[in-house]
Amino acid sequence: EEELAKAQQALNDAEPLASGGSDEGVVNGFYAAFHAAQAALYDRGIEPSSHGAIRNRFGEALVLDGSVDRSQGRLLTTLADLRQQVDYGYEPIDADVATLLDRTRSFVESMAALVDSEPGE
């Protein structure tokens, strides 16, 4: 539940940044997806130790077993790559931040539904 709350807060923080034209909305969008993915993994008893491990374990534990669609795994990877570009790149990103945040909101909702629908812990 704590990770899902963090995901929701990151989404809430991302929206004004994106509507103001800031690429920083992507960073918050990544953290929203990151925390939601982490919640789904924790629910399955998986405790990854890094951002990269979360992406890998998400693919192994949730995408490959069919619990989530491959497009959700790709979104997590896309957001991670864009976050790196925003944080460390010198050029603006070439992405529609509003659309990414819409997809991220759906991702967070899907992970919350997954956590609520399956017994965990």
Predicted regions located by residue number:
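Terminal alpha-helical segments
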Residues: E1-E121
